[in-house]
């Protein structure tokens, strides 16, 4: 998934914990039917709730018409709940998880791509804690 950013956008440091939203795919665990597994819809990375994840790969910025975009090197989050729900509804077994960028972590503001015109406010972060499911289909 890509994050469109303004040409002059820079990473900021979180002065406090910041709440955003992550869309994940949710599947039942075959060995424990009341437990679910979660994975990222684009990269297919399995994640666990209440655990911190850090992106160690360098963020690579590329040109895209009138803006730039970051393809990898950040963890993508939605800036608002309604946009996350809309994307979860378009994702196989989609759900929305409350995601916290921990104080002191780097993040960059941008827009979700492939949304038409890169118009859905989104965030790219180097660190995140997935807290709990706040929406499921």
Question: Regions from the language model: what does each represent?
Answer:
Residues 1-75, 81-137:
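Conserved NAD+-utilizing ADP-ribose enzyme module
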